[in-house]
């Protein structure tokens, strides 16, 4: 028995609209929900707490180079598999899948352009490719970036964003620490400035080699910078670590960094540095 009857037909609704993927971003620090446009307008930082989201090399190039114009070079280098490494998966299969999903070919990109009228070579790491790990291709690209700086007598900026050496390449990866350090010494011998920008994270063999060798070492706020991770150190020494240990602010206080620069001020600060160095 029906007690109630609908006096009017049901309200007509259009087909459900799917929200575009990536329209809202969640801050990993404070948990705030941020609209994509809002994040972009704040240079990919959280407008609530200042957290810096990770950028790709191309995003850094667009942020820093005048009129977003630059020339990428040595983008044809690909990782080899000299050790025939395999853990849960074969190394070449892992690289192939990343290429298929993201289009990324390596953990480093090189470009040359102008920043406020000053020539600058930038070598930028990409955390989206195996955690920005340093393998033989990364070492070679940094080496070629040094060569480009020498060729054009232009300062070099390396943007570090890496978990360290790439375990799949074993000793070949560790060799890049010495290789990049030796090549950077050639810049110093010629009086060509090298600026190191450390972002979150800059760890392992990266921090133990080229990342800490800058004539000027700068960092984004609250970046994790160190060799072994805080948890590993804590478990090894069986002691609690100082508050903020291995964060950029702690390193600045203890003399490891020259300055910490918010991303919105990064190009302006680089322009100042390049202006002082060129004069």
UniProtKB/Swiss-Prot annotation:
Keywords: ATP-binding, Cytoplasm, Fatty acid biosynthesis, Fatty acid metabolism, Lipid biosynthesis, Lipid metabolism, Metal-binding, Nucleotide-binding, Transferase, Zinc, Zinc-finger. It comes from Prosthecochloris aestuarii (strain DSM 271 / SK 413). This is Acetyl-coenzyme A carboxylase carboxyl transferase subunit beta. Its main location: cytoplasm. Its EC number is 2.1.3.15. NCBIfam families: accD. Zn(2+) binds at residues 27, 30, 46, 49. Binds 1 zinc ion per subunit. It is found in: Cytoplasm. InterPro entries: AcCoA_carboxyl_beta (IPR034733), Acetyl_CoA_COase_Trfase_b_su (IPR000438), ClpP/crotonase-like_dom_sf (IPR029045), COA_CT_N (IPR011762), Znf-ACC (IPR041010). It catalyses: N(6)-carboxybiotinyl-L-lysyl-[protein] + acetyl-CoA = N(6)-biotinyl-L-lysyl-[protein] + malonyl-CoA. Residues 23-279 form the CoA carboxyltransferase N-terminal domain.
């Amino acid at each position: 028995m029906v007690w109630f009857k609908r006096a009017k037909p049901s309200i007509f609704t259009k087909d459900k609209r799917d929200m575009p993927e990536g329209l809202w971003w969640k801050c990993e620090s404070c948990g705030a929900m941020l609209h994509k446009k809002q994040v972009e307008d704040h240079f990919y930082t959280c407008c609530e707490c200042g957290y810096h989201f990770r950028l790709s090399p191309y995003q850094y190039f667009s942020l820093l180079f005048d009129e977003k114009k630059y020339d990428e070079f040595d983008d044809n280098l690909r990782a080899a598999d000299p050790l025939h490494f395999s853990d849960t998966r074969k190394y070449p299969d892992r690289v192939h899948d990343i290429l298929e999903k993201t289009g990324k070919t390596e953990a480093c990109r090189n470009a040359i352009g102008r920043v406020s009228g000053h020539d600058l070579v930038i070598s930028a790491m990409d955390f989206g490719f195996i955690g920005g790990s340093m393998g033989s291709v990364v070492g070679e690209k940094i080496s070629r970036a040094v060569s480009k700086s020498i060729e054009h007598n232009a300062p070099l900026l390396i943007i570090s964003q890496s978990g360290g050496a790439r375990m799949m390449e074993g000793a070949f990866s560790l060799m890049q620490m010495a290789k990049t350090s030796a090549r950077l010494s050639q810049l110093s011998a010629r009086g060509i400035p090298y600026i190191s920008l450390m972002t979150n994270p800059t760890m392992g063999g990266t921090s133990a080699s080229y990342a800490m060798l800058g004539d000027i070492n700068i960092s984004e706020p609250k970046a994790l910078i160190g060799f072994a991770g805080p948890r590993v150190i804590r478990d090894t020494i069986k002691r609690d670590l100082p508050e903020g240990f291995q964060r950029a602010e702690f390193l600045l206080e203890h003399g490891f960094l020259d300055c910490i620069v918010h991303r919105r001020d990064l190009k302006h600060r680089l322009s100042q540095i390049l202006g002082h160095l060129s004069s």
